[in-house]
Structure formats: structure tokens, C-alpha cells
Amino acid sequence: MTRLPLLKRPRRNRKSAAIRSMIRETNMVSSDLIWPIFLKEGSGIREEIPSMPGVYRWSLDTISRELERLCLIGLKAVILFPVIEDQKKDQFGAYASHPYNIVCRGIQEIKKSFPQLCVISDIALDPFTTSGHDGIFYNNEVLNDESVRVYGDIATLHAEMGADIVAPSDMMDGRVRHIREKMDQMGFVNTGILSYSAKYASYLYGPFRDALSSHPQSGDKRQYQMDPANVREALLECRLDEEEGADMVMIKPAGFYLDVIMKAQECTHLPVVAYQVSGEYSMIMAASLHGWLSKEGAISESLLAIKRAGATAIISYATPWVLEWLARDALPF
């Protein structure tokens, strides 16, 4: 056979698994992953969420057993979300400031049992309000400054309970500065802030709202969440949050916004966390359950793409599976 006179043959670097692994530009490790946990009052609870196959609502006793298993295979960080009964919700989300609510007790118990874990608490009102909005909803509007004051109180409470990092997800103006000042005044100078800096008004949040029963009852979240068409606005939000005292910024969703992740990494000196949201996860799971694609392959590829775009860490509902694959050196790439 006559060979073509090719000086460059890039395929030489792909001819074996050993070579491909040696020169790989992006790798996944267990410390890249943050596991989101839905906590619910009660005991013995492990309820699968229909719109999120493989994701569960947990009571504190059952999550402790699962965390024990996952810590043995490399889990380093979790972020907590509360599932609140309707009778404990009101217009103002007052139960969010109660020191015995499920997220406060979750922070305490998880830090006590697993002190090595980084525990991140989501700072939001939508699980606690009857409106389902991320702030105080009044006269068809989410009130910015009044909501920010409440978030300062909630963040300080979570810091007191032992949260390593608080994560305000509301997209209210000025909330990072207020939370930082409030926590510092109360002596929690070492509690970090992971700000949801660019939280887009996405159609991909539906399964998450199913999990928390927090669908907005009226009004429009586009009044405060970002327009999916905008990227410069996201960079402005990242810079503002850095100036206000954030320790990390977040881009949410992740997979549809890889360009934003890349540009955010270039515009800030802070770590950039990306959230692979419920809709992204559920699309992959639905297709895999129909046999249309490989669950392992699609999840791994999606997370690799997010990290390749520049994410420092990734919040993903697939974290338990990925930890298992990493522990067995069984990632499909």
C-alpha cells in the first residue's frame, strides 16, 4: 500500500488508551463535584422524585447512611435544599429564619457526623414562601431591599449552625455585600459566600421545583433572574459580586451556558462553580431510560464539557454515580 507523504498524523496521539490518558487536557476528579441534597422532615424517608429519576428526598437518618457510603469513595462537598410542608409556608417565608427548620438541623447534623465535608447551604426563600418566589412577593413584585435584609439574617443563622459556605440564589441586587457585612458583624468572618452570580431565567428548573413543590404561583421570575440572551450582563454580575465580597461565583444552568462559564473564568479571579441543573440531568436520564443514549457516557461527557469550559467545581445530581465510576476507574473517557 502506498503511504501518503503526511508529515503530521494527529491520530498517532490517539492510538492507545495509555497515550490518550497521558495527554488528556481535562480530567475529572472527585473533588470537582458537589452533591445537591433535598432534605425533608421525618424519618426513614427516601422518596424518588418522578421527574428526576435516581434523585431522592431524604430524611436526616437516611441521608446520614448515604453520606457515609459516599464519603468513602471521595465525596467532598454537598449543598442542601429544604423540602418544606405547605402549612409551614407563608407570604414572607418566615420559617426560613427558624433555627429548627430542616436545613438548619441538616447543617448541624451533617457537620457533626461528617466534619470533613464542605457543607454549603442554599440561601433562598422560594422553598418557604406561598408564592414560590425567591424573595418577598408583594403587589405582583419581588421586593429587593426587604428580601436582602431577610437573606442577611438567614445566612447568619446558617453560619451559626456550622455551614462552611452560604450560597444566595435569589439574584437580588446588593445581597452579597449585605450578607458579608452581616456575617462579619456577627463574627462569622470565615464563612464563605458562593454567589449565584449569573442565574438565568431558564426553562430547565422544572424538575427542581417539582422536588421542592416551589413552582411560582404568579408573577414572573424574569423580573430578577437573567435573560438567557445576555452574556455581558453575567460578567457584570460576577464582577459586582467579587467587589461585594463573594468568595466564589456560580453560573446556572451549566450545559447550555458553556460560553458564559468560559468568559466568567476570564473576567474574575474567583473560583467559578457551575450548576448542572435538574432539567439538564433529567433530559439525559430520560433519554438513557429509553435506550437512546448511554447514561454513563452522556453524564461523563456533559460534566467534562462543563469542566473544559473552565468550571472550578460542578454541582450535579449525578455526583453519586460519578464518584462510583471514578472509584472504579470506569469513566467512559
UniProtKB/Swiss-Prot annotation:
Claim: Nucleus is one of the keywords in the record: no
Record GO cellular component, one term: cytosol
Enzyme Commission code(s) on record: 4.2.1.24
GO biological process, one term: protoporphyrinogen IX biosynthetic process
A Gene Ontology molecular function term of the record: porphobilinogen synthase activity
Subunit note: Homooctamer.
Entry protein name: Delta-aminolevulinic acid dehydratase
Annotated organism of origin: Chlamydia muridarum (strain MoPn / Nigg)
